């Protein structure tokens, strides 16, 4: 069976109050189809943080994974920047 390419996203941790779970906000720029202006579109996803190494405000990289719970489909890969 061939290994699939999994999606990777970079975002900011907006909540770390759950056990082994973080909430990551991903901000993307999309162009409006009629007006051709760029809009900021953000979404929040829950990610699994096994070692609980990320804190509020950190910039992190997450990767798509199998369903871990009802809402968790992402796993933390690495912390890119620590918050100050």
Swiss-Prot record:
Pfam families: Ribosomal_S17. GO terms for cellular component: cytosolic small ribosomal subunit. The keyword Cell wall biogenesis/degradation does not apply. One of its GO terms (molecular function) is rRNA binding. One of its GO terms (biological process) is translation. Gene3D superfamilies: Nucleic acid-binding proteins. Keywords: Ribonucleoprotein, Ribosomal protein, RNA-binding, rRNA-binding. Part of the 30S ribosomal subunit. One of the primary rRNA binding proteins, it binds specifically to the 5'-end of 16S ribosomal RNA. NCBIfam families: PRK05610.1, uS17_bact. Belongs to the universal ribosomal protein uS17 family. This is Small ribosomal subunit protein uS17. The lineage of its organism: Bacteria, Pseudomonadati, Spirochaetota, Spirochaetia, Spirochaetales. The gene is rpsQ.
């Amino acid at each position: 069976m061939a290994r699939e390419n999994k999606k990777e996203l970079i975002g900011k941790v907006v909540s770390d109050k759950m056990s082994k779970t973080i909430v990551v906000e991903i901000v993307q720029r999309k162009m409006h189809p009629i007006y051709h202006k760029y809009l900021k579109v953000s979404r929040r996803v829950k990610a699994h943080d096994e070692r609980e190494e990320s804190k509020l405000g950190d910039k992190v990289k997450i990767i798509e994974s199998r369903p871990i719970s009802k809402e968790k489909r992402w796993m933390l890969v690495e912390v890119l920047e620590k918050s100050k």
